[in-house]
Amino acid sequence: MNYKTEDIADGKEVFISGSFTFRDHDTFFEIISLLKTGSCKKLIFNLSGCDFIDSAGLGMFVIAHDEAESKSIELVIKGAQGKVRDVMLATRFDSLYTFEN
């Protein structure tokens, strides 16, 4: 997994590309640290470049949700496609995150 961040009006957009698996947990926790800054009110995970996610990757998104919920931060999944989108919807991530095309 690779990622880059961009500032948006009320938070950050994180562009995730490649495969997102258990071995990316240290990298993902760097991203979660963005939720701990007081100025972040919205965090968008742009998955348009993500081509695979395993169960550990899904679990990390649950951890991000729990952290964000405790701080009233809006979370968005943007651009998820193909099997990544299918597995996220099949596991009801649309009940945790707002999904955008």
Q: What is each residue range found by the language model?
A:
Residues M1-N2, N101:
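Absolute protein N-terminus
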